[in-house]
Amino acid sequence: MDTKLLELLVCPVTKGHLEYDREKHELISRSARLAYPVRDGIPVMLENEARTLTDEELGL
């Protein structure tokens, strides 16, 4: 994922910072506890396409 693009993107739910998980190809919003998929290099920033993160995934 392009780092400049990542700097511009925010979580559509919280408007907060996103982290890119290279292994799972997901953008992580810790504040919303959601992981948005990146398909073919394109972030899918739809809440209904995101999966909920577990406490373990968040390191809690």
From Swiss-Prot:
Pfam families: Trm112p. GO terms for cellular component: cytosol. InterPro entries: Trm112-like. It comes from the Bacteria. Belongs to the UPF0434 family. This is UPF0434 protein Pnap_1922. It comes from Polaromonas naphthalenivorans (strain CJ2). The lineage of its organism: Bacteria, Pseudomonadati, Pseudomonadota, Betaproteobacteria, Burkholderiales.
